[in-house]
Amino acid sequence: MESKRMEEPYFTFGIIADIQYADMDNRFNYLKTSMRYYRNSLTQLKAAVEEWAMESIKPAFILQLGDIIDGINTKDKSSKTALERVLVEMDKLPIQFHHVWGNHEFYNFSREYLNGSKLNSQARGDRIDRGGGTSENGEFNDESFYAYHFSPCPKFRFLLIDGYDLSPIGREKTSPKYDIALNLLKEKNPNEDLNSPTGLEEVQFVLFNGGISPSQLDWMERVLTSSDEKEENVFVVSHLPVHPDAADPMCLVWNYPEVLSVLQSHPCVVGYLAGHNHEGRYCMDPYGIHHLTFSGVIETPPESRAFGTMYVYEDKMVLKGRGLVEDRTLYYRDPKNKAERH
């Protein structure tokens, strides 16, 4: 009996990415390389919700890794209707969702709208030292970033970061960050179509990606330093991947080397979870951080699935994947060697 208790996880959580629902017929993606199943993505979500509800160990929460509806909804002004249809399905699960914002959130809605919507899950995070989407008086502040952290269990923390903090699509044109982002993008990408990586040395500098501002990097440093001191295990969560071996290089955060430098300098970081690259990829970097990019629901054939449940233990996390998401056992870096990070 004791051994059985020892095998039980501290907690579990669900993960799903790139639902990109729209009430539209199937069509190829932007690059014409893969089919997108717009209506079926809602069916895929329903299947995930049903399975999570039936699990013997109920997930403590669900991570929704961004791009909840597709930008194509703007063509017939159905963005709000599409979002409501997705949220209705999520609400059938009596478990909290933590939402990340991706490029398709910003194709459909302004940052101010998202801040006041159900996709703003900041209230479910710790209220101490949040990144914040509001100013000190509670009003919306377009210069802030959407980021927060929470601890579902002692010694474990999740840090959600804003990959479109610096982005022309993630900021209003009146925002100073808009000008900074657009100037940087045009400096790195001379193409007329800013979504095209043709001829670029740094192919991540396309319009559908974004960057992390110095202020957000500083905030991440503070949170991770605190977690180091508390000897916590931290999972960093974003829409955009940050490791070249965990995604197509065209899908990375603009300044991913800076972000990686921050993550790798903190022994508390054990994993980085992302979406955006629909085929999904995985790598463990030289510092022992697991970079897991999840397959996108939108490009998952009707006969398959694309979601998972992570089981969190003292020394490892075990992913039970469905369909395109593979099962994985991911051990944390040896605590004795954590101090070797620099």
From Swiss-Prot:
Task: State the family named in the UniProt similarity comment for this chain.
Answer: Belongs to the ADPRibase-Mn family.
Task: Name the cofactor(s).
Answer: Mg(2+)
Q: Which reaction does it catalyse?
A: CDP-choline + H2O = phosphocholine + CMP + 2 H(+); ADP-D-ribose + H2O = D-ribose 5-phosphate + AMP + 2 H(+); CDP-glycerol + H2O = sn-glycerol 3-phosphate + CMP + 2 H(+)
| InterPro entries from the UniProt entry | Calcineurin-like_PHP_ApaH, Metallo-depent_PP-like, MPP_ADPRM
The alphabetized UniProt keywords are:
Hydrolase, Metal-binding, Zinc
Question: Which Pfam families does the record associate with it?
Answer: Metallophos
Q: Which organism is it from?
A: Xenopus tropicalis
Q: What does this protein do?
A: Hydrolyzes ADP-ribose, IDP-ribose, CDP-glycerol, CDP-choline and CDP-ethanolamine, but not other non-reducing ADP-sugars or CDP-glucose.
Q: Which GO terms describe its molecular function?
A: ADP-ribose diphosphatase activity; CDP-glycerol diphosphatase activity; metal ion binding
Is tRNA-binding found in the keyword set?
Answer: no
Q: Which residues form a coiled coil?
A: none
- Top-level EC class: hydrolase
Transmembrane segment boundaries: none
Instruction: Outline the subunit composition.
Output: Monomer.
Q: Which residues bind Zn(2+) 2?
A: D67, N103, H239, H276
Q: What is this protein called?
A: Manganese-dependent ADP-ribose/CDP-alcohol diphosphatase
Q: Does the keyword Hydrolase apply?
A: yes
EC annotation from Swiss-Prot or TrEMBL: 3.6.1.13, 3.6.1.16, 3.6.1.53
Annotated residues for binding of Zn(2+) 1: D18, Q20, D67, H278
